[in-house]
Design a protein with these regions (language model features):
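Membrane-embedded transmembrane alpha-helical bundles that form the catalytic cores
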Residues: 1-419, 424, 429-469
Length: 470
C-alpha cells in the first residue's frame, strides 16, 4: 500500500482516523491502534516481509535493552553497539547489496555465481537507518533504553514514514508516544500539508514524469541534445515534487495523528553551492550521515586531508545507500567531489560571482540527475555527452513536442515557480498574503488538490514514489 493510492485515501486512512478519534484521551490505546494499522499497511503489498520488519523490531529492542545495561562507553557497550550495527547492516546488505557484491566477486574471480534477484522490502533503508540511529544515540547516553516493545515497534513501523521517510530520530519521536496533542488546528494543518503533498506528487511529478519516461524510452541514437537537456530539467522537477510531495504527505499524516515529523526539504534548487544543496535536500539523510558517519570518522577535526577523505567516504556511502550500482556510486562521488572542491577554496569564489553560483550548482545537480535517472553509468555518460555537445546530435524521428505534451508544459511552469520562487516572491512583495493561510481560499484550494489528484488516480495515473526503490 502507498499513501497516494486509492485504497489508502478512500478506506485505510478514513477508518484509522475515525478509530483514533474514538480513543479519546487514551494515548496507549491510540499507540496500539497505530501500530496495528502500520503493520497492516506494511503487509498489504507483500505480507511475507512483515516477518522481516518484526524481526528487525525485536532485534533492536533486545539489543537496546542489552546496551542500556552497560556502562557508558565501556568495552562491553562498544561490543553490543557494534553487534547491533552489524545486525542491521547485515539485514540491509543481504536484501539490497547481495547481488551487487556477487557481481564484483564474479568479475574478480572469473566465477559465474547465479544472481538471486532478491526483492527489496519496502522502506528497509529507512527503518534500518532509524534503528541504527536509536542504538548509536543510546550508546552516547542521549536517553534511556526503550522498555516498552510496542513503542519501539511504532517508532520503526509508523506508516506515514516507513515507505519513503523522512528518517525520524528516536529522541524526537519517543516523547510524542506518551505526550502529543490532537487538536483541530493541528489536524487542519495536517490535512493542508497532506493535500499539498498529494498535489505535488500526482498533479506535477506524475504528469511531468510521463514525458521524462517517453524521452528516456527512446533509443539513445534517436535522442537529440535538446531532448536530453529537456529530460534532465523535467526529471529534476519530477524527483523534487515526487519526493518532497511524499514528505509533505508523511508530515501531514503525522500531524493528523498528533505527531511532528521532521522536515526533509528546504527549496534545494535555490542553493548557491553543492554544500548548500545538501543542507536543503533530503535533510534527514544528510544529517544522518553527518551525525553517524562523518563525525565518528573525525569530521573536520583531524586536518584537511582527513576531512576530504571523510567527505569522500560519506558521499560514497550516500550513493550506495540509493542503490547497488556503479551509477549511484558515481552520482554520490560527483556530489562528493564538488563538495571537496568547494571546501578546498572554490566556495570563496562562488560567494563572489553572484548569480553564476546558482548556474554552477544547477548544472552539477542536473548532470547528477541524468546519472541517477538512467541508473546505468555507461549510457548515462552517453546522455551527458549529448548535453555537452548538443549541436552534434540534432536528428530524431520524433519532434520534441510529440514527447512533451501540453499538460507537461503547464505543470513544468507551475513546478519551476513552486520550487521557491513563488514563496520568496510572496514573502518579499506581498507579505499580507501570508494571512490567507488557513482561510477559506486555502481550504478551497486544498479541496481542489485532493479532488483533482483522486480523479487522476481513478483514471489510472497512479505511480509509486521514486524513493520507494531505495
Amino acid at each position: 500500500m502507498s499513501i497516494n493510492s486509492m485504497i489508502f485515501l478512500t478506506a485505510f486512512l478514513p477508518v484509522v482516523f475515525v478509530l483514533d478519534r474514538l480513543c479519546v484521551r487514551k494515548t496507549a490505546l491510540k499507540n496500539i491502534l497505530l501500530l496495528l494499522a502500520s503493520l497492516v499497511f506494511y503487509a498489504w503489498g507483500d505480507p511475507v516481509y512483515i516477518v522481516l520488519l518484526l524481526v528487525s523490531i525485536a532485534a533492536n529492542y533486545g539489543i537496546g535493552l542489552l546496551l542500556g545495561c552497560q556502562r557508558d562507553e565501556s568495552v562491553a557497550a562498544k561490543t553490543v553497539l557494534a553487534a547491533g550495527i552489524l545486525v542491521n547492516l547485515g539485514i540491509l546488505g543481504y536484501y539490497k547489496y547481495f547481488d551487487f557484491f556477487l557481481r564484483i566477486v564474479n568479475r574478480l574471480t572469473g566465477s559465474e555465481h547465479e544472481m538471486r534477484n532478491i526483492p527489496l522490502p519496502i522502506g528497509i533503508s529507512f527503518f534500518t537507518f532509524g534503528a541504527i540511529s536509536y542504538l548509536m544515540d543510546l550508546y552516547r547516553g542521549h536517553y534511556e533504553a526503550e522498555k516498552n516493545p510496542l513503542n519501539m515497534a511504532l517508532y520503526l513501523s509508523f506508516f506515514p514514514k516507513i515507505s519513503v521517510g523522512p528518517i525520524a530520530r528516536y529522541r524526537d519521536f519517543a516523547p510524542q508516544l506518551t505526550n502529543r496533542q490532537e487538536t483541530v488546528e493541528k489536524t487542519a494543518e495536517g490535512i493542508r500539508r497532506f493535500a499539498y503533498g498529494l498535489g505535488k506528487k500526482v498533479l506535477v511529478a506524475n504528469i511531468v514524469g510521463a514525458s521524462v519516461d517517453k524521452i528516456y524510452a527512446q533509443d539513445i541514437t534517436n535522442v537529440t541534445g535538446v531532448m536530453v537537456w529537456c529530460a534532465a530539467i523535467l526529471y529534476a522537477i519530477q524527483i523534487y515534487y515526487d519526493f518532497s510531495g511524499f514528505t509533505d504527505m508523511a508530515i501531514g499524516l503525522g500531524k493528523m495523528f498528533g505527531f511532528d515529523i521532521c522536515e526533509n526539504f528546504n527549496y534545494p534548487y535555490l542553493s548557491g553551492s553543492i554544500q548548500e544543496f545538501w543542507r536543503r535536500w533530503h535533510i534527514s539523510l544528510s544529517s544522518w550521515f553527518r551525525d553517524y558517519l562523518y563525525i565518528p570518522l573525525g569530521g573536520n577535526r583531524k586536518g584537511k586531508a582527513r576531512t576530504y577523505l571523510n567527505l569522500a567516504i560519506v558521499f560514497f556511502a550516500t550513493g550506495l545507500w540509493h542503490g547497488a550500482t556503479t551509477a549511484f556510486i558515481a552520482w554520490g562521488a560527483l556530489h562528493g567531489f564538488f563538495i571537496i572542491v568547494e571546501r578546498i577554496g572554490f566556495k570563496k569564489i562562488l560567494d563572489k560571482i553572484g548569480f553564476l553560483r546558482y548556474v554552477y550548482t544547477g548544472l552539477v545537480v542536473l548532470f547528477g540527475w541524468v546519472i541517477f535517472r538512467v541508473a546505468n553509468l555507461r549510457p548515462a555518460l552517453q546522455y551527458i555527452r549529448r548535453m555537452l555537445t548538443p549541436w552534434q546530435y540534432t536528428q530524431s524521428t520524433y519532434a520534441l513536442r510529440e514527447l512533451v505534451g501540453n499538460r507537461c508544459i503547464v505543470m513544468t511552469v507551475i513546478g519551476i515557480l513552486g520550487m521557491g520562487l513563488i514563496q520568496a516572491g510572496i514573502k518579499k512583495f506581498c507579505p499580507a498574503a501570508e494571512k490567507l493561510k488557513g482561510g477559506v481560499l486555502e481550504l478551497v484550494y486544498c479541496m481542489f488538490l485532493i479532488a483533482a489528484s483522486m480523479l487522476l488516480l481513478v483514471n489510472g495515473t497512479y505511480s509509486p514514489a521514486i524513493y520507494l526503490n531505495f
